[in-house]
Structure formats: structure tokens, C-alpha cells
């Protein structure tokens, strides 16, 4: 019988596997707001379901938090956090964003969670971490007023 990594890597290479590699990821808004909770929930789900690879689901807007976005969490697993303060109020502020420091804040928490997950599951379980497209990040850090001015093309097709 193959271990998780052998199964996933064989499938990627198009080689025979003992069974199809399986995984699943989801937002659990009540368990993804700290590195410890995200790691514990990811490891719990892995042990419960025997997933072959993991894609830890970072909290919904954690990357926007790196630039000052403030959120209010419901504590419920199916209710996304509400934005209490946008990182950007309008398009003029876009140029003021600075590169995020991976050693602090939300990004550091995500890296801490990945390290804790790796320590808990060992090297035989592949972990896939992703960063969504920068366009999606921009959409999550600005107010509706910013959306109206930048994201919606005018009838002539130009960006207003």
C-alpha cells in the first residue's frame, strides 16, 4: 500500500496508484482565525478522513489584514467575518500599500500554521499552500466606493 506522498506523486506523474488521492478543503470560520486553531482543525480533518494531501484553508481575508483591514468574527463556522474597516477607502490609496512583512501579522500566522501542520502530519503528507491572484486581493481590501470607481468599466469600455 502506498503512503500519502507516494500516492499523490504517482498520480501527478500519471503512474498507477493503489487508489485515487483524496483531499478536501473548506472554510471553517470559527477555526481559522489563529495559527493554532487553523493547524489543529487541519490536522483533525486529516486524521478523521485520511486525506492524501492538505490545502490548509487560511482565513477568508487574512491577506487583506496585512494592510490594515479589520474584521469582526462571528465565531460560527459557516458565517464569514464582517469587514469593519477596509484597508483602502478609495483608489488614490492603492499606491500607498507597502510590501507585507512575512514575519509579522496575518502572513506570519499562516506560515506558523503551515509549520505546525507539517510537524503534526510529517513529511509523508503533501501540503499545498496557495495565494489567490493579486486582483482578488485588491478586491478584498477596498470599500464599495473603490469598486465603483476602479473595477467597473464604463460603457465605452474604459476603466473609470
Where are these regions (language model features)?
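Active-site-proximal, glycine-rich beta->alpha crossover segments in alpha/beta enzymes
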Residues: 72-160
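N-terminal basic, low-complexity leaders that serve as flexible interaction/assembly modules and, when applicable
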Residues: 1-79, 112
Amino acid at each position: 500500500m502506498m503512503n500519502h506522498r507516494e500516492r499523490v506523486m504517482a498520480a501527478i506523474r500519471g503512474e498507477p496508484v493503489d487508489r485515487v488521492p483524496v483531499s478536501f478543503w473548506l472554510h471553517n470560520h470559527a477555526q481559522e482565525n489563529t495559527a493554532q486553531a487553523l493547524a489543529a482543525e487541519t490536522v483533525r480533518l486529516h486524521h478523521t478522513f485520511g486525506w492524501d494531501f492538505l490545502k490548509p484553508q487560511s482565513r477568508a481575508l487574512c491577506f487583506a489584514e496585512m494592510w490594515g483591514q479589520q474584521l469582526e468574527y462571528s465565531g460560527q463556522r459557516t458565517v464569514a467575518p464582517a469587514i469593519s474597516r477596509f484597508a483602502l477607502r478609495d483608489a488614490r490609496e492603492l499606491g500607498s500599500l507597502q510590501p507585507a512583512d512575512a514575519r509579522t501579522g496575518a502572513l506570519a500566522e499562516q506560515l506558523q500554521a503551515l509549520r505546525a501542520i507539517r510537524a503534526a502530519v510529517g513529511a509523508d503528507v503533501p501540503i499545498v499552500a496557495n495565494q489567490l491572484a493579486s486582483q482578488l486581493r485588491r478586491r478584498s481590501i477596498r470599500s464599495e466606493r473603490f469598486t465603483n470607481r476602479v473595477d467597473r468599466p464604463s460603457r465605452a469600455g474604459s476603466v473609470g
